[in-house]
């Protein structure tokens, strides 16, 4: 397996195949043959990945004028980065290195080349021991010393070692070693330069939040504002609640909105009336707003029942105006944007039917009440049912009809008697 450095960065490959393996030999460890098979002592990939990058100094970002002295064909690494992928792999010198024949000819005792990015060490001291074995004796102490530095410090020290030999924490021996190895890393490229398109990104614009005072709060300031607000809220618990102005502030990270609700107290109003000038200069007091949730204790004994007369609901007196209000009906205006006119007609028809039905019931009820008042037996019976009212009214009508027929017969008899008397009077007048 080819290493990640050789497979993704063709600019780091030397044109001389004899120096290729010697340059990259310290990056491979033969003891890692079983690392991809999940050994018991193996660690997950990526734990000590940065530890390996600390072992060797990072090469310079770009070659200088010394490239022409050591190479007959100067390589412009920026041009190679801009060339298509097919042109990069079409170099015959690179094909020999990436080919199987080139790898077999590098050494008589080939080892399994593994990816340094995804291999791991179970022992933290293993990388230093392997590098000390691979490098010459004069460079072992320098390599181990460089490996113990931080990633940022090691990269800075190695890049600055080509220009300044008096860097803090680096001796003369390290400067001499870097000078000797300068001809080997002329064609090497920093990994950050290889991933230039991925790292070169424009910063995203930070949204701003307009406030009432005219200032804007950015996204970066929002996090600091929330943290400082929490500290201020935790420290404001000891403030007296007598003459303060409570502000409830709610911050939502998704909407970046701030809602402030003002809850003035009676004491604050009194203080404002006494000293109006001090109220303007006083700072806003932010107080934590906690929701009080009361839960019923089922284990507690029940409270004694207290019968209060004032707690009983009073019955509303029945008014006669309610009947008149029910009769008055104001039809609602049709809604704008109705789906169909037929639906509105059906609704209007139902409303008219209901209105007429209510009117009919009210008229019938009033008729029964009037009929009850006409029947002598039901005049004082206000709770008489409709059936009783109809029955008594029918009987009363029959009696009235019988009395009427009797009166008619009597009237007829009286009329006949009247006629007889008139004839007698005429006879006495002629005599």
Curated annotation (Swiss-Prot):
Alphabetized PROSITE patterns for the sequence: BHLH
Molecular functions (GO terms): DNA binding; DNA-binding transcription factor activity; protein dimerization activity
Protein name: Protein S-Myc
Function: Has apoptosis-inducing activity.
SMART domains: HLH
Keywords, ordered alphabetically: Apoptosis, DNA-binding, Nucleus, Phosphoprotein
InterPro entries with a match to the protein in the record: bHLH_dom, HLH_DNA-bd_sf, Myc_transcription_factors, Tscrpt_reg_Myc, Tscrpt_reg_Myc_N
Subunit annotation: Efficient DNA binding requires dimerization with another bHLH protein.
Domain bHLH: start-end pairs: 348-400
Cell compartment(s), UniProt: Nucleus
Gene Ontology terms describing biological process: apoptotic process
Chain segments carrying region Leucine-zipper: 400-421
GO cellular component terms listed in the entry, alphabetical order: nucleus
Residues with PTM Phosphotyrosine: 36
Keyword Nucleus among record annotations: yes
